[in-house]
């Protein structure tokens, strides 16, 4: 996946060329909250100086994590090794201590914030060009969350635990009052048939995932 600073200009260019058309759809995929964490070198962290909760990754827990081997453990952040990447200098290859674990969590948080900044740029464009109207639907979601120390796993989504299964789902839909929050259990496999129903198009009972 490409970083947001490469994706967003293409998004804005596409909107400039197609935004005035009727019945368009644009799918935008941002990779920045995904490992390797790759916010630009000059992007200022918004989370430095915020300590880990005392009851989260304690010294005893982290010492145990250092004994683990395998994909995305503290000793092998990058799946099978502790390599680093010149193009992503912020991303570590291994975690030596709790401070390094905190740094990795900050990088993830920065990736989420950076993605949010870029989504904001797209929404600002829509609003400033008269495209954010009563007919526009916007869906912001993800395919997975991220483990950041749970079960000794860092920067990975290979387990069906709560941090991995908990994803954002923000929907702005024509004719639906905003500001509502639904707290019940939902599954993102329901998104496609739900959108089809809202659009009044044909739905099928044989979806395969």
Residue spans of the language-model regions?
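Catalytic domains that recognize anionic headgroups
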Residues: 1-209
């Amino acid at each position: 996946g490409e970083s947001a600073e490469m994706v967003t200009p293409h998004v804005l260019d596409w909107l400039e060329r197609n935004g005035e058309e009727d019945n368009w759809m644009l799918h935008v995929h941002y990779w920045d909250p995904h490992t390797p964490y790759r916010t630009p070198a000059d992007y200022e962290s918004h989370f430095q100086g915020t300590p880990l909760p005392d009851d989260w990754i304690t010294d005893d827990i982290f010492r145990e994590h250092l004994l683990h081997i395998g994909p995305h453990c503290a000793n092998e952040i990058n799946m099978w090794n502790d390599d680093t990447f010149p193009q992503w200098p912020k991303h570590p290859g291994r975690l030596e201590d709790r401070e390094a674990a905190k740094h990795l969590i900050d990088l993830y948080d920065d990736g989420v914030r950076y993605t949010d900044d870029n989504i904001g740029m797209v929404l600002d464009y829509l609003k400033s060009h008269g495209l954010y109207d009563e007919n526009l639907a916007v869906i912001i979601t993800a395919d997975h969350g991220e483990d950041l120390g749970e079960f000794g796993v860092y920067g990975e989504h290979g387990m069906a635990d709560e941090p991995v299964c908990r994803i954002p789902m923000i929907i702005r839909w024509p004719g639906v009052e905003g500001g509502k929050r639904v707290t019940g259990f939902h599954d993102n496999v329901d998104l496609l048939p739900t959108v089809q129903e809202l659009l009044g198009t044909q739905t099928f009972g044989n979806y395969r995932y």
